[in-house]
């Protein structure tokens, strides 16, 4: 049905889509973490809906993002692996559908769908995104106006850019805002205010720390990214701290 701007604003929900990247469920206290406290995520979980039985067919960054925006498997939206792009002309895309219904649409932060290679964010009234993974400190943001380097920590910057847009948006219309953070994707580089967060905290070894996987499935025994064998530059994306080098 067609609605006037006023009618649409009255019935349409405001949509704020916050994404954290490569964020393990066991690093969220709403899912039982005793080390990582996430009070704001917990509040949303307790007052909203917390999913406990979720699965993904292709857990890489780029295909996951393509699937979320299109509602299609990677082989359908042609975003199968890292390095692929999301064709701006591909249909459907969630933000395009909302835009056609009178929503203001915006995305800030990590896009990772080929912005430098023809994968321009389509269906967004405003977009300002990182190139690929982006940097934690002094990141480069890309928009229709070009590139700009913004001094500071990427999580704070992404949040501030989102807030700036929300404050100046057309309040006669509903909005769809994608606040897509880079963190906590590797390399793990905390912001200045959090760099000493665990300085005086004794972190208990997880019960599986010394597991030899002898009683696990073959697929589990072949898994990489283990602390014992794979905590290296290839895995961390930075040189490991001297204290944890074997």
PLM region spans:
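Formylglycine-dependent sulfatase
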Residues: 1-246
């Amino acid at each position: 049905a067609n609605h006037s701007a006023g009618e649409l604003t009255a019935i349409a929900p405001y949509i704020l889509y916050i994404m954290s990247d490569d964020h393990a469920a066991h690093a969220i206290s709403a899912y039982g973490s005793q080390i990582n406290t996430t009070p704001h995520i917990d509040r949303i979980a307790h007052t909203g809906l917390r999913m406990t039985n979720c699965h993904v067919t292709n857990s890489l960054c780029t295909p996951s993002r393509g699937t979320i925006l299109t509602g299609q498997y990677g082989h359908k939206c042609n975003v199968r692996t890292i390095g692929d792009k999301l064709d701006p002309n591909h249909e459907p895309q969630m933000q395009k559908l909302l835009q056609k219904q009178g929503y203001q649409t915006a995305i800030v932060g990590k896009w990772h769908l080929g912005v430098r290679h023809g994968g321009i964010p389509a269906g967004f009234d405003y977009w300002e995104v990182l190139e690929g993974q982006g940097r934690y400190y002094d990141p480069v943001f890309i928009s229709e106006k070009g590139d700009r380097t913004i001094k500071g920590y990427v999580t704070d910057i992404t949040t501030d850019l989102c807030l700036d847009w929300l404050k100046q948006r057309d309040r006669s219309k509903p909005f769809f805002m994608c606040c897509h953070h880079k963190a906590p994707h590797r390399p793990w580089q905390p912001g200045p205010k959090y760099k000493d967060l665990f300085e005086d905290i004794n972190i208990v070894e997880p019960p599986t720390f010394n597991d030899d996987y002898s009683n696990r499935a073959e697929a589990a025994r072949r898994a990489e990214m283990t602390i014992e064998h794979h905590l290296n530059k290839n895995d961390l994306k930075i040189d490991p701290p001297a204290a944890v080098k074997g």
